[in-house]
UniProtKB/Swiss-Prot annotation:
Region (Disordered) residue spans: 1-25
NCBIfam families in the cross-refs: S20 (TIGR00029)
Domain of life the protein comes from: Bacteria
Record-linked InterPro entries: Ribosomal_bS20, Ribosomal_bS20_sf
Pfam families assigned: Ribosomal_S20p (PF01649)
Keyword DNA repair attached: no
Record protein name field: Small ribosomal subunit protein bS20
Species whose genome carries this gene: Mycolicibacterium paratuberculosis (strain ATCC BAA-968 / K-10)
Protein keywords: Ribonucleoprotein, Ribosomal protein, RNA-binding, rRNA-binding
Role noted for this protein: Binds directly to 16S ribosomal RNA.
Length: 86
């Protein structure tokens, strides 16, 4: 436990941010998994619809600093390629 008051406050802030980031990353994984399942099933319409929502979530996570912008770009590119293969 920190002795300095400002560090105690930072620890609280960091813990809140960690939990928030964990939640965002979990929802990202769920969105990507849903897209991949739709793509694997060959449902092009549903996959295209899920791609849009997944891309929005990836962009938002990148803009908030939860994931790196290049990671978001790489995931978006891979998902688009998967959709185009259908």
């Amino acid at each position: 436990m920190a002795n300095i008051k400002s560090q105690q406050k930072r620890n609280k802030t960091n813990e809140r941010a960690r939990l928030r980031n964990k939640s965002v990353k979990s929802s990202l994984r769920t969105a990507v998994r849903a897209f991949r399942e739709a793509a694997h099933a060959g449902d092009k319409e549903k996959a295209a619809e899920l791609l849009v929502s997944t891309n929005r979530k990836l962009d938002k996570a990148a803009s908030k600093g939860v994931i790196h912008k290049n990671q978001a770009a790489n995931k978006k590119s891979a998902l688009a390629q998967a959709l185009n293969k259908l």
